[in-house]
């Protein structure tokens, strides 16, 4: 939800920053299927009944290399290295914690979420988390819409996606060098 809110905000601010929203439909994204497969793996890991925790954890970790296929194929777009860094930090935190993103109990409480919800969770308070600072340590307060927890990796992914949207649209918020680099490779 955090990423969706950032994408909506980025799109809404493009015209305010002198960009053209029409440019979004002109960009040719490659390997879009990887987004659907990667996110599908994550959703299936959380929602499919009858899977062992080990299989669920493996599916969560496996989603990241699949999503990386999209990132590598679209590396020329502004912001993709930032998205990749955020994804790598999330993958690291998840991989060293058995397929679960560690969540700060304080962040979960602040977002109004259960620290120990039943069943497999993609983000949960763990007894002895590794690299806890890379986990979901930030929160949107429970009193706000879309309250949830998120990580520094999520922040970097959101910033990278916003940078990509503004860069593709020619916004003044993205340095002209990044825009001209994208424009020098039309149809790529």
Please state what every model-predicted region is.
Residues 20-22, 166-181:
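Membrane-interface capping segments at transmembrane-helix boundaries
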Residues 1-62:
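Transmembrane alpha-helical insertion/packing segments
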Residues 63-97:
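Interfacial segments of alpha-helical transmembrane regions
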Residues 181-188:
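Long, low-complexity, intrinsically disordered cytosolic termini of multi-pass membrane proteins
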Residues 39, 57, 87, 133, ...:
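Hydrophobic transmembrane-helix microenvironments that flank and shape a buried ionizable site
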Residues 103-149:
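Extracytosolic (periplasmic/ER-lumenal) interhelical loops and adjacent juxtamembrane/interface segments
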Residues 55-62, 147-159:
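Membrane-interface loop-to-helix entry segments
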Residues 78-83, 100-110, 177:
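A cytosolic-side transmembrane-helix exit/cap motif
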């Amino acid at each position: 939800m955090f990423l969706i809110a950032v994408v909506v905000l980025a799109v809404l601010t493009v015209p305010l920053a002198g960009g053209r929203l029409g440019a979004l439909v002109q960009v040719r994204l490659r390997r879009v299927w990887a987004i659907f497969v990667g996110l599908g793996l994550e959703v299936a890991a959380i929602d499919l009944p009858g899977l062992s925790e080990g299989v669920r954890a493996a599916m969560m970790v496996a989603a990241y290399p699949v999503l990386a296929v999209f990132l590598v194929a679209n590396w020329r777009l502004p912001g993709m290295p930032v998205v990749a860094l955020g994804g790598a930090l999330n993958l690291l935190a998840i991989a060293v914690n058995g397929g679960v993103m560690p969540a700060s109990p304080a962040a979960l409480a602040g977002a109004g979420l259960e620290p120990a919800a039943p069943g497999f969770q993609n983000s949960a308070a763990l007894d002895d988390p590794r690299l806890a600072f890379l986990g979901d340590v930030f929160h949107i307060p429970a009193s706000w819409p879309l309250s949830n927890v998120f990580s520094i990796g999520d922040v970097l992914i959101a910033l990278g996606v916003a940078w990509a949207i503004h860069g593709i649209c020619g916004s003044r918020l993205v340095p002209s060098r990044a825009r001209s680099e994208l424009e020098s490779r039309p149809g790529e």
